[in-house]
Amino acid sequence: MTPEVLRQWQELAEQVREHQFRYYVRDAPVITDAEFDELLRRLEALEEQYPELRTPDSPTQLVGGAGFATEFEPVEHLERMLSLDNAFNTEELTAWAGRIHADVGDSAAYLCELKIDGVALSLVYEGGRLTRASTRGDGRTGEDVTLNARTIEDVPERLSHSEDHRMPEVLEVRGEVFFRVADFQALNASLVEEGKAPFANPRNSAAGSLRQKDPAVTARRRLRMICHGLGHTEGFRPATLHQAYLALQAWGLPVSQHTTLVADLAGVQERIDYWGEHRHEVDHEIDGVVVKVDDVALQRRLGSTSRAPRWAIAYKYPPEEAQTKLLDIRVNVGRTGRVTPFAFMTPVKVAGSTVAQATLHNASEVKRKGVLIGDTVVIRKAGDVIPEVLGPVVDLRDGSEREFVMPTTCPECGTPLAPEKEGDADIRCPNTRSCPGQLRERVFHVSSRNALDIEMLGYEAGAALLSARVIGDEGDLFGLTEEELLRTDLFRTKAGDLSANGRRLLANLDKAKAAPLWRVLVALSIRHVGPTAARALATEFGSIDAIVSATTEQLAAVEGVGPTIASAVSEWFTVDWHREIVEKWRAAGVRMADERDDSVPRTLAGVTVVVTGSLPGFSRDEAKEAIVTRGGKAAGSVSKKTSYVVAGDAPGSKYDKAVELGVPILDEDGFRKLLEQGPPAEVGEPT
């Protein structure tokens, strides 16, 4: 081995460890997964050629997070928590299966599981109760994140009883914590709205959310978990992995519904091909298929290396990234005045669709990513996730690139731009009432799916109505007449009559007048008020007038609202032209209060109920609706103000909180009686 080879190994090993630190500890990687995999494979190839380089402390021999100090208390796993080896093509998968065959013959059946792009978590249950949750760490010692894990709805505080599966004395179960795509998008949107940097991808957001110092922050983020393996167990020795999954499910632990048992490598390849085509039909991101030998005895025979089991492998799909030219960086003015830079690029196909634009969030993000106009950039798009510019390909720069300069005046109306308050990352156009860009976005927002969901009132239609001065702002929408629509080319036929689309628009506007109050609140473009907060306000107050009359403190006290949203709502209604929009809509017949169904008895007036666990007779939304329609409040957390907790199968930490505070606990039968008869005289724990 020459000094040059040793130098090359040292450089590669140092790069791998640096990127592992950024990935596992800082949750802020600066290269893509594919680029990291390539670095690791180069290091492995070098060690294959020169085995003396394969020392115990080489990154190829360690689990990803090994050796890094963290801010959480260290905790030892009962059994080592290993990583997985990867296969990137059919040849590597076949070679792995060949090694299995050489060792155990044709007797191995395989489990095929979706490889969720999340963060690994280990749960320990003793006597059926959750006693510890920890991250992977170096495989032997992880970080104690028990308090945060208890806030994840999928993680039961106690295992459920099962007639078919005896509950083990000790159960160490491994799984993946992740964000659903829709929840990830909602989280990033809220971060950007608050002037904070968004997460790069769902995996980073899951890791960052799980490792919050304040469990309340984790609780507000809709993390999910799926269990996919076992560690140490006492009183539980399943013969196969798929039998183990059936037991986990019976005990109330979340397992994937997409796992398939196949007989041979041909079946494995069929699953890999299938999910390669259908990966975006799942509500969370996947980056491959994990293949495992199902027979536990064969697993023990095959054993493991220092970092990964020999009986499992992760087949990884090609990255959903592409390179293209950044032609320009332009800015867009949003409905609340926020000025957002976006990338204008040479169209490129990625993740099954053609991408030509991507948001850059704010000037700070442009600087952080280090992109210049004229750069070749790497973009990423997975399924329905909004396209994202990851960064520049610096080696391809030729000197013609130039920096982006954020404008100082609004590109739509010329008003000087400024942050709303000192320290904000976002800059805004303060001309909120008449800025053409804000007007177009607000009119379009009224028709959006989360607001009043008005078909035929798309971006083009809204712009046409404004440019023809048929409407002055969104307040005029519900007063539109056939004569006014005829003033726009878009809704007029060649014969001068109202087009079919024009008639549909008028009909849809009329239909939208009867929308529930929460949709009206969303449609008003009150900052921070999305469907969740709007539903909470509508449920608590019932009418626009009651919301206007409420103090900021009363608004903030509503579950799911809080002080930031409460202040935004109060401030919005103090603006004269905002109230004019409300009155225009009211005069046009838009419903400003929710109708109460008098046929449903108000048995829960003044009662606050928290539901935890699964109820066979109710979905989560059905249970909440049953409470609200009877005048009660369906809360999301337990406090001294909680009247009752309804505990279904696999209740979470809310059950323990109720016991601690002495809050009455009902089972499903007790819940039904509560709905029918109102509060009973005495309520005990479910039997």
Curated annotation (Swiss-Prot):
The cofactors it requires, by name, are: Mg(2+); Mn(2+)
Q: Where is the BRCT domain?
A: 599-687
The terms describing its cellular component in GO are:
cytosol
What is catalyzed by this enzyme? NAD(+) + (deoxyribonucleotide)n-3'-hydroxyl + 5'-phospho-(deoxyribonucleotide)m = (deoxyribonucleotide)n+m + AMP + beta-nicotinamide D-nucleotide
Provide the binding site for Zn(2+).
410, 413, 429, 435
Gene Ontology biological process: DNA repair; DNA replication
Binding locations of NAD(+): 33-37, 83-84, 113, 136, 176, 292, 316
Q: List the InterPro entries hit by this protein, alphabetically.
A: BRCT_dom, BRCT_dom_sf, DisA/LigA_HHH, DNA_ligase, DNA_ligase_AS, DNA_ligase_CS, DNAligase_adenylation, DNAligase_N
Pfam families in alphabetical order:
BRCT (PF00533), DNA_ligase_aden (PF01653), DNA_ligase_OB (PF03120), DNA_ligase_ZBD (PF03119), HHH_2 (PF12826), Nlig-Ia (PF22745)
**Which Gene3D superfamilies does the annotation name?**
5' to 3' exonuclease, C-terminal subdomain, 6.20.10.30, BRCT domain, DNA ligase/mRNA capping enzyme, Helix hairpin bin, Nucleic acid-binding proteins
- Gene Ontology MF annotations: DNA ligase (NAD+) activity; metal ion binding
**Active site per database record:** 115 (n6-amp-lysine intermediate)
Which CDD domains is this protein grouped with?
A: BRCT_DNA_ligase_like, LIGANc
What's its EC? 6.5.1.2
The protein's superkingdom reads Bacteria
What's in the keyword line of the UniProt record?
DNA damage, DNA repair, DNA replication, Ligase, Magnesium, Manganese, Metal-binding, NAD, Zinc
Look up the coiled coil feature and give its residue ranges.
Answer: none
- Job of this protein: DNA ligase that catalyzes the formation of phosphodiester linkages between 5'-phosphoryl and 3'-hydroxyl groups in double-stranded DNA using NAD as a coenzyme and as the energy source for the reaction. It is essential for DNA replication and repair of damaged DNA.
PANTHER family found in the cross-reference section? CHROMOSOME TRANSMISSION FIDELITY FACTOR 18, DNA LIGASE
Q: Which family is annotated? A: Belongs to the NAD-dependent DNA ligase family. LigA subfamily.
Q: State what protein this is by name.
A: DNA ligase
Q: What is the gene called?
A: ligA
